[in-house]
């Protein structure tokens, strides 16, 4: 991970659901700061090689490289993501990590239209690092 070492507590040191929620909130911020700034290298450190990304509009993407390529081609400079305040839910997955559920908004620079969608993200803690293993992004539409 080099320059992108994680500062989020490991699953083995988290003692409460509140601590887990703080950790996953920090991970979500790291992930989408990289997404919003097109930091593909950082983004790549936060997802597993066999990532599965399910999207209601574009279908299934399997693998880190196809996912990062899609971000480069379709997202960089075209879309920014914002977590809807108060929407985040985090639940422990024993011996694995956590499930993150929430609502996010997507802004297109120079366009007043704002999209909104729901998401479920599985975070795995393995070998001293948190990484996204599965994502379901669904119910995309205009902001409600």
Give the location of each predicted region:
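A short, structured loop/turn motif at beta-sheet edges
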Residues: 90-98, 124-129
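Short beta-strand edge/turn micro-motifs at domain boundaries
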Residues: 6, 116-141
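Short, surface-exposed coil-to-beta transition loops
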Residues: 83-86, 101, 113-120
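Short, low-complexity N-terminal intrinsically disordered segments enriched in polar/charged residues
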Residues: 2-49, 144
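A solvent-exposed, acidic/Ser-Thr-rich amphipathic alpha-helical stretch
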Residues: 18, 22, 40-96, 103-105
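Beta-strand elements of well-folded, non-transmembrane domains
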Residues: 106-108, 123
């Amino acid at each position: 991970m080099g320059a992108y070492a994680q500062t989020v507590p490991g699953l083995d040191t988290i003692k409460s659901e509140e601590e887990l929620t703080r950790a996953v909130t920090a991970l979500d911020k790291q992930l989408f700061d990289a997404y919003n700034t097109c930091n593909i290298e950082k983004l790549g450190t936060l997802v597993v090689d066999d990532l599965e990304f399910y999207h209601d509009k574009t279908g299934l993407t399997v693998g880190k490289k196809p996912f990062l390529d899609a971000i480069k081609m379709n997202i960089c400079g075209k879309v920014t993501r914002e977590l809807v305040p108060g929407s985040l839910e985090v639940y422990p997955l024993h011996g694995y990590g956590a499930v993150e559920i929430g609502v996010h908004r997507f802004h297109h620079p120079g366009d007043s239209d704002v999209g909104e969608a729901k998401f479920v993200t599985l975070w795995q803690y393995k070998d001293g690092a948190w990484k996204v293993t599965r994502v379901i992004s669904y119910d995309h539409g205009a902001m409600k």
